[in-house]
Structures are given as structure tokens and as C-alpha cells.
Amino acid sequence: MKVWMAILISILCWQSSVWAVCPAWSPARAQEEISRLQQQIKQWDDDYWKEGKSEVEDGVYDQLSARLTQWQRCFGSEPRDVMMPPLNGAVMHPVAHTGVRKMVDKNALSLWMRERSDLWVQPKVDGVAVTLVYRDGKLNKAISRGNGLKGEDWTQKVSLISAVPQTVSGPLANSTLQGEIFLQREGHIQQQMGGINARAKVAGLMMRQDDSDTLNSLGVFVWAWPDGPQLMTDRLKELATAGFTLTQRYTRAVKNADEVARVRNEWWKAKLPFVTDGVVVRGAKEPESRHWLPGQAEWLVAWKYQPVAQVAEVKAIQFAVGKSGKISVVASLAPVMLDDKKVQRVNIGSVRRWQEWDIAPGDQILVSLAGQGIPRIDDVVWRGAERTKPTPPENRFNSLTCYFASDVCQEQFISRLVWLGSKQVLGLDGIGEAGWRALHQTHRFEHIFSWLLLTPEQLQNTPGIAKSKSAQLWHQFNLARKQPFTRWVMAMGIPLTRAALNASDERSWSQLLFSTEQFWQQLPGTGSGRARQVIEWKENAQIKKLGSWLAAQQITGFEP
């Protein structure tokens, strides 16, 4: 009893953290938003169950269904029944499908496993559930899961699936099996390939009116043999002998949550013959089948994988000005987890790209991780009923603006500071965007090199800069004075690559100022257009003023 209370508390704590984030909507707005999403999900359900097609990815459907339930709980509506199929022409299951309760995390699974023994882990194969009924050694009936008590008669369809044994013998001759009809895959790696909408594809094949040869692309994974042999090893052996070989191959004994986690991670990265969305842990000891009821299984639980892509709510649209003056758009998100990374922001790109995406606060977007773990937008999966998009700033900035601070230059000025402090430029360790903002807000820099004048006392008394860090920062600023001339020129934003700048052999400011367009044009990777940009840059009044200031500070290469 204590274990169940602990699991319940764990689940409630997790749920409360999700449900607590309720939209700040009026009752009328809430009713409209809930009604619109409810109608859309109902349409998807009708397409799925009546026509066997899906206009939405399985993962997106699941997450938007969960979002709808969250909204309904937030505003006191009755949560919808999830994915309840129509019961036209339904057939009673000899043994009810119980479904499986989902564990929130490894800790919840560990609590569930603590007082249980003889436990086994299987992949949670992603397809559609089915009952197989054998009588006198022959396949007598195949029934879709339906609502767990009744389902559709799939006997004709299943009889055409070559992977399903049509005859069996021994203990299986008069048996009822439960399993998953799945899309057969060759070397499917879940981590890399995701769900590929497998559930909807299988449903589509099973719903088609024609008995297509494509049914042979389906397989079956038996995960339950109600009233079968008591020992799991005996069950697996008999199933394998009958032709259900995958069950024995992918069922492993486990003693604790750590072992489950290892197997789960292994299958997440391994080449498998089917799509999966997690693992199921089940006890070998099961009640008699007459006691099985939908939603009442206490002997098995699931631990699903985190989706490769997550549906996230857009909380705000923000505009950033980079060091070159380009305006980029960033979406601020309600936090989601991707792998082990908490994602709260995603870069949309240019203003034009944002307008093409048509993203507004309140929309639901699908986010995944691209190379090097960078969040990206895959799709806009739901747009809110009321959409207000902010106005982007005027495009008044360019590569030669905001070397000196002003109110309108705030964002580009900070971007320039972040750039010059980066490893590839002046290498100022220990300070990023937040640190630069704190310094500028307190000391009101005149230009991008004003930080060279800060004293240890000023750094120590800067809000947002830890006193223990201020001495290290002052040391970094002093070390920067000894950086090579080319590094300082890069910090000033010269429109050249480092390779081209090094090849120029320019080692002083005066020498650089007298270099001609023809000189720059002969450098590697520098054409006529780039050479003209360099000339425009070095003749800019702000650049000349910065060069004179650095000379007064006796920075290497700038001295008269």
C-alpha cells in the first residue's frame, strides 16, 4: 500500500507541475480554444477509425490530445475520451484488453517494481492492438482492440498477413493471444528515425477495403497469453515454436529499474524490426483472464520514450539584432524536454522566415533538436483562435552601425560585445550576454571597448557580477590588451575571414588604413565585393574613432 501511495504522489506531483501552467484566458476564450481543438481531434479520430488515414503524426496527435485534456482540467471541462473508436459491427473480446498505465519516470518505475518479482521487459511496439483466437489449432477470429471489450472483426485481414500463423498446436491450439500488429521494418533505429507515423499506417492498411498484398508488410508481436503457462519461459518457448518468434527474442528478465533503463536505452539505439515508443514491464504472474478489465491491469506498466519532437506553446515572439545588424526572430516557449535538454527558446530566423511560418504567441509548434543539440522548428501544429503578432523593429541597422552605445542601438551593441568576447576573437573567458548587459547597464559604456577602463572596484560593485568573479574578469580584460593586432581588428568587425586577415600580413593600424582595394582583392577568398566592403569599413567615422581610442590605450598595432 505504501508503494502505491508513493507512486500516486509521484504522479500527482508531476501532473500538478503540468496542470499548474494554465493559460490566462477568459471563460469565453477558453471555451472557444477548447472547442476548436476538440473538433479537430474528433476529425482526426473519424479519419483514423473510419477511413484508416491520418493527417497528423502520431506523436503530434498524442501531445495535442494531452494538451486538450490539460486545458479541460484548467477550466473545469470534462476531459474527452481518448481515441474511442466507433463500435459499428463490434465483436466481443474473449478476454478484455486492459491497456497499460504509463510510468512518469525511472523513480516511479522503481517504486512499482520494489515489491514485485519475476518481472520481464518487452519493447512497447508501436502499431495497433489485436486479439488472436485459436480454436482446434486454427485461427478462428481476429479482433481489433476497439474499446477493450469490443472491437472490429479483422479475421479476413489478419488471415492474409503471412507473419501470423494460421495454424498452431499443443497448448496454443485453443488459446487467446493479445498482441500488436506492426509495420515490419529492417533495421529501424528509434533514436534516429522516430515513429514514422507507424500506428496510423498500420491502421490505414487494416481499414482498406481491398485485400492488398501490402498486408504482407505487417507483422505481429504477441505480448500476452491470458491463462497461458505459469512460467514466462514456457510461454516464450511455446510461442516461438508456433511461429511467434519475436516475443521470445525481445522479452528479457529484469530485477530493478536500472536493468530496465539499460535495456530501454539499448533498444532506443538498436536496429529493430519494428517501431517502438518505449518499453513495457510485466509480471509473469497474472490474474485469471475473467478478471481482466480495461484500465485495471496492476501487473504491467509502460515507460515510454521521450518524443524525438515535442509540441511546445509559444509564449512570446522576440526580436534580436546581431552584430552585423541583421534582425532575427526568436520564439520564447513554455519549457519542454528534448533528450536531456530543457528547451525554452528556438530561433525562427529572419523576419521574412517568421512571416512565412506565421507564428504568434499561443500557437503550438513542433520542436526537435538539430545537429549539435540546437533546437529547431519542424512545424506549426496548432494556431490559437486569437492571434496577435508583434511588430518587428525597423530595419535601420547594418554592419557599420552601433559601435557606439545609444538607446536605439541597445541590441546590436550587446551583440558586438558578445562577439568580441568570444573565444575566436579576444577570448574573454567567464562573460557572456548576461554579464555584458550587467556591465553596460551599470557603467553605461560609450563604445564597444569602454570595458578596458573598468577598475577592479567598479567590477566588484557591479550588480549581477559575483564578487568572486570580478577579479578574474579584470584579469581577463587586462590580458586582452596583449592579444595580437589581428584579433583587435576582428573585434572591430572587419569584413574578412581570419584566414584572409592573417594572409594580409597587416600588423599595424596605419598600414591597414593605407591599403588599397586592389590589395584586399588579392587575398584568399576575397573578391571585389568583399574588398569594397573593407574599404567602406576602414573609412567609416566610427571605426576611425575606435582606432584612435585604441591607440591612446597603447593597444598593440594601434600605436602611432
Swiss-Prot record:
EC class of the enzyme, as a word: ligase
Biological process annotations from GO: DNA repair; DNA replication
Catalytic activity, as annotated: NAD(+) + (deoxyribonucleotide)n-3'-hydroxyl + 5'-phospho-(deoxyribonucleotide)m = (deoxyribonucleotide)n+m + AMP + beta-nicotinamide D-nucleotide
Entries under PROSITE patterns matching the protein: DNA_LIGASE_N1 (PS01055), DNA_LIGASE_N2 (PS01056)
Covalent S-S links between cysteines: none
GO molecular function, a single term: DNA ligase (NAD+) activity
Pfam families attached to this UniProt entry: DNA_ligase_aden, DNA_ligase_OB
Name of the protein in its database record: DNA ligase B
Lineage of the species this protein comes from: Bacteria, Pseudomonadati, Pseudomonadota, Gammaproteobacteria, Enterobacterales
Gene designation per UniProt: ligB
